[in-house]
Regions:
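Weak global preference for isoleucine
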Residues: 26, 31, 49, 56, ...
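General "foldedness" signal
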Residues: 83, 88-90, 151, 157, ...
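Beta-strand-rich solenoid/repeat architectures in extracellular/passenger domains
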Residues: 93-124, 134-149, 159-170
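Generic marker of "main functional regions" within proteins
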Residues: 60, 79-82, 138, 153, ...
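Structural detector of coil-to-beta-strand junctions
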Residues: 125-129, 150-154
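Extracellular zinc-dependent metalloprotease catalytic-domain scaffold
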Residues: 1-94
């Protein structure tokens, strides 16, 4: 069983190099839904809140999980919680390059844009989240958050290179 929805699909489609998948409206093979022995559903996203992993490495939802909840009808502005999400993996022969030019700051409910003059005050927020392996990420924009337990850059994966230019602040 797989879950797909408009927001979830958008996250995975923008993070694909497959032009055929990028043109699809909605696919239903983005996130696998599994069931434990007691028939409780969980997502096949390692080490996340909505998974059944033995080890949960962060006490809040990932962007993928927030998008699932949004697709199920919850009223969530994901931009409040996560600036940029990368859900993609390269190979050991070829790293996937990502240039992040969108910063993370306080998000305005009225203009629906980030406010570069105000840091985010949302607890447990993440400026940039990399969920995958073999990525090269150039964080070319600032991340400003003063929320309790906020993280500038969260990496769930291996063999990722994160490059932060000297003039970028996190």
């Amino acid at each position: 069983l797989y879950f797909g929805g408009e927001n979830t699909n958008r996250l995975f489609v923008k993070n694909t190099n497959d032009p055929l998948k990028r043109d699809q409206k909605i696919t239903f093979d983005n996130i696998q839904v599994l069931f434990d022995k007691d028939s409780n559903a969980y997502l096949n996203l390692r080490n996340t809140i909505l998974s059944n992993s033995c080890f949960i490495n962060y006490g809040f939802y990932t962007l993928a999980e927030l998008n699932v909840l949004k697709d199920l009808g919850y009223d969530i502005d994901t931009e409040d919680f996560v600036g940029t999400g990368i859900y993609q993996s390269g190979t050991n022969n070829e790293l996937l390059a990502h240039d992040i030019s969108k910063g993370f700051y306080a998000f305005s409910d009225t203009t629906h844009e980030y406010q570069p003059d105000k840091p985010s005050k949302i607890p447990l927020s993440i400026g940039t989240h990399v969920y995958g392996n073999y990525n090269e990420v150039h964080q070319n924009s600032n991340i400003a958050s003063i929320g309790f337990a906020s993280v500038g850059i969260r990496v769930d994966g291996s063999y990722n290179n994160i490059i932060v230019p000297k003039n970028t602040t996190i």
